[in-house]
Amino acid sequence: LSTVEEALFLIQGLNAHDIFPDWIALNNGTTHGIEASGKGIQVDLTTSIHDALEKYRVSGAQHGTSGNSSDRLREIASQTRTTKANVATALQMVSWGLEVNDYGNAKLDDQGNFFKVRDQGMTEAMWSELVAYAQDQGWKGGNYKKLNLPFENKLLSQAGEIRNRMVKRVEEFIYNMLVNVLNAENTAPLTVAAILEAGSYDAGPKGERIEDPAQWTPEEIIKRGASISSDKGPEGDFDD
């Protein structure tokens, strides 16, 4: 897991050289795929790191949002400085027509197979083709996300009615997440106003240099980096 010390080392070093990131992504318990442990994102850890970076005006980018409960996502929205959330895996499963819970975690049977909802998402014939391909590759669970690339053209060549129902399913899922989980209801006018005020979609850097470049020379960076000690967790292959 990421630490306050590591995050400060990164952001302070960049700041000293006039680089002001809009976001920082942390290793804070996320799963890029399907969240199966029930632990998920560590909100307290995320909050402590974001608080330590407050004066650098860096927001949080939350990877691995898919599969974390709505309650945990509400905690992230209310307790941390997160303004960007990645939900790619959840949207993939939703668009395909798989059975998911209210926060996008696809349901699996005892053998690790997905449940396809009839007449939702892609056609049943297309789903059968995806499953057969995945079996040939030895893919299960979160590795199904790798199917998007080889099947992109086939998914896009389905009848308009099928493509539209895939889009509609994603639209409904995202609307619920934005409005009922992430507190984004009625924020579009605020975004439009900010864009108009800046005269661009790019509002420029939020931060400014407050670190002394003399303290962040290559030699000093190497020295500081060598003094950082943190628990990297157990060794092993944790690919999902």
Where in the sequence are the language-model features?
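C-terminal extensions of enzymes
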Residues: 133-240
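Catalytic cores of alpha/beta
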Residues: 66-82
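Structural alpha-beta junctions
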Residues: 53-59, 81-84, 180, 184
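Glycine-rich phosphate-binding active-site loops on the catalytic face of alpha/beta enzymes
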Residues: 30-35, 79-99
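Hydrophobic faces of well-ordered beta-strands that scaffold small-molecule active sites
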Residues: 22-26, 58-63, 83-87
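C-terminal helical cap(s) of enzyme catalytic domains, especially alpha/beta-barrels
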Residues: 95-117, 163, 167-175
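Alpha/beta enzyme core
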Residues: 1-56, 75, 79
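Charged, glycine/proline-rich intrinsically disordered loops and linkers
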Residues: 102-149
